[in-house]
């Protein structure tokens, strides 16, 4: 039999942990989370990198305009999935870019880039 003070402590800890977990938004491990501030310097930097890298790889001349929406996913670093408005000549279109970022290694890779 567990002593009464220890039982009360365990019950209190269980109730506290349930309250903490219940108050959080649940996102599956490795799931995509919406980016709250699309205008942050970090998001803008990743978006501009995506357009610049696409231009190098595809010999294109898109001009970055803005981030329309975006999501992050924690992996061995961070994946950014961004919908970017970019100008192709006089026409503005939306493009989806996925960028893998590991800032502590000064590593950034454009995983995909496509018109949406």
Curated annotation (Swiss-Prot):
SUPFAM superfamilies: Cystatin/monellin. SMART domains: CY. Its main location: secreted. Glycans are attached at residue 109. A motif (Secondary area of contact) lies at residues 73-77. GO terms for cellular component: extracellular region. The record marks 30 as: Reactive site. The lineage of its organism: Eukaryota, Viridiplantae, Streptophyta, Embryophyta, Tracheophyta. Keywords: Allergen, Glycoprotein, Plant defense, Protease inhibitor, Secreted, Signal, Thiol protease inhibitor. One of its GO terms (molecular function) is cysteine-type endopeptidase inhibitor activity. InterPro entries: Cystatin_dom, Cystatin_sf. Belongs to the cystatin family. Phytocystatin subfamily. This is Cysteine proteinase inhibitor 1. GO terms for biological process: defense response. Residues 30-89 form the Cystatin domain. The gene is CYT1. It is found in: Secreted.
């Amino acid at each position: 039999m567990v002593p009464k003070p220890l039982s009360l402590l365990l019950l209190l800890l269980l109730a506290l942990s349930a309250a903490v977990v219940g108050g959080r938004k649940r996102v599956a491990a490795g799931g995509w989370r919406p980016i709250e501030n699309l205008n942050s310097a970090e998001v803008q930097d990743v978006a501009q990198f995506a357009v610049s890298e696409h231009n190098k790889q595809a010999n294109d001349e898109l001009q970055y305009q803005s981030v329309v929406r975006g999501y992050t996913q924690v992996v061995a670093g961070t994946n950014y999935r961004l919908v970017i408005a970019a100008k192709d000549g006089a026409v503005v279109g939306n493009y989806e870019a996925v960028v893998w970022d590991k800032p502590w290694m000064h590593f950034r890779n454009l995983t995909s880039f496509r018109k949406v």
